[in-house]
């Protein structure tokens, strides 16, 4: 029984040693990647922050979370872009239809009524253009709000996952730092993936 307990201890010690080696390797790679960031950002990423980040990355779960968040973000951006293109296309169609309707009306109009018709058509065109501008502004506001919500969701998810540096904020400096941390995680994930392929 004593020998079995000793073997369990050796396995646990070996696992701990592997985890420490992986932590050190991740930390070293993070320190290398940080050198490519602007100096203002480098100063904000202390050894402790990078060490905590390396610890959070140990089991690979955070890599999967970040990958999932990026996929959701790309799908959201693609969907919002499609919605904006659709609105733009509808507006273009509306203006073309109005232009053709006005042209037909002018061709059927008696010459002495033409100035009145053109003035009415000008007012109608201005009203349509105002409506188009308003709808585009509303669409752009909707896009910004939806993207802001995605950022909050990402911050919350990564904070709950225990990733150092992530919490809900709208502070531009903190957002820049979080974006840089995400970029570090993404680059480290690529390196990990490439090294796994090399050994397989």
Curated annotation (Swiss-Prot):
Residues 116-146, 176-198 form a coiled coil. Keywords: Coiled coil. InterPro entries: Gonadal (IPR010849). Pfam families: DGCR6. Belongs to the gonadal family. This is Protein DGCR6. The lineage of its organism: Eukaryota, Metazoa, Chordata, Craniata, Vertebrata. The gene is DGCR6.
